[in-house]
C-alpha cells in the first residue's frame, strides 16, 4: 500500500513539473508564440522620441573634477621596499 502511494506521489509530482515547464510564460504585451502586438511596439517607438541626443548639464564643481581626474595606480615611489631589513643568508 505504501509503495502504491509513493508511486502515485511521484507520478503527480512529475505531472506538475512537466505542466510547469511546458506552460506558456506570459509577459505584459506579448502574444502567444512570443510575438508582440504591433500597436504596443509603435507606442514604444513613439515614446523613444525622434532619436535626438540629450545633452547633460555642465558641472564645474570640485567633486566633478576629482571624479574625472585620472588616478595613478602604480606608485613609482619604491622607498618602502628599502625599509625592509634583510637578514643575511648563513
UniProtKB/Swiss-Prot annotation:
Instruction: Tell me the domain of life.
Output: Eukaryota
List of residues that carry Pyrrolidone carboxylic acid: 24
Organism of derivation: Dicentrarchus labrax (European seabass)
Membership in a protein family = Belongs to the GnRH family.
Record's subcellular location = Secreted
Per the entry, what this protein does is: Stimulates the secretion of gonadotropins.
Q: Which UniProt keywords apply?
A: Amidation, Cleavage on pair of basic residues, Hormone, Pyrrolidone carboxylic acid, Secreted, Signal
Gene coding for it: gnrh3
Q: Where is the signal peptide?
A: 1-23
Sequence segments annotated as region (Disordered): 56-90
Tell me where in this chain the PTM Glycine amide is found. 33
For this UniProt entry, what's an example GO CC term?
Answer: extracellular space
Kindly give the InterPro entries that the UniProt entry links to this protein: GnRH (IPR002012), Gonadoliberin (IPR019792)
Protein name as catalogued? Progonadoliberin-3
| Molecular function, one GO term | gonadotropin hormone-releasing hormone activity
